[in-house]
């Protein structure tokens, strides 16, 4: 279980020094219907017949890499950057600090 604080003192490219940053978890945006690959795929799928491209079944990974979105809290900066972390099954943002040997509750 990974617990990350909601704020972090880290380097800001705009100010060229360490500044406090607000930490949030990156989430993938909705796929566009008008991207060329999607338009081509939909065109190929239309009409009679089954799938024209193979559907991927052989998934290997059980977790995703956590990506943190760091936003500078300075009002006239607000620059953002992404920071990839390791894989984990349970991710928590700004949770209570746990003591050694304490039972984990989900």
Curated annotation (Swiss-Prot):
Main location: cytoplasm
GO molecular function: structural constituent of ribosome
Gene3D superfamilies, alphabetized: 3.10.450.80
Superkingdom of origin: Eukaryota
GO cellular component: cytoplasm; ribonucleoprotein complex; ribosome
Family per similarity comment: Belongs to the eukaryotic ribosomal protein eL42 family.
Function as written in the Swiss-Prot or TrEMBL entry: Component of the large ribosomal subunit. The ribosome is a large ribonucleoprotein complex responsible for the synthesis of proteins in the cell.
Protein name per the record: Large ribosomal subunit protein eL42
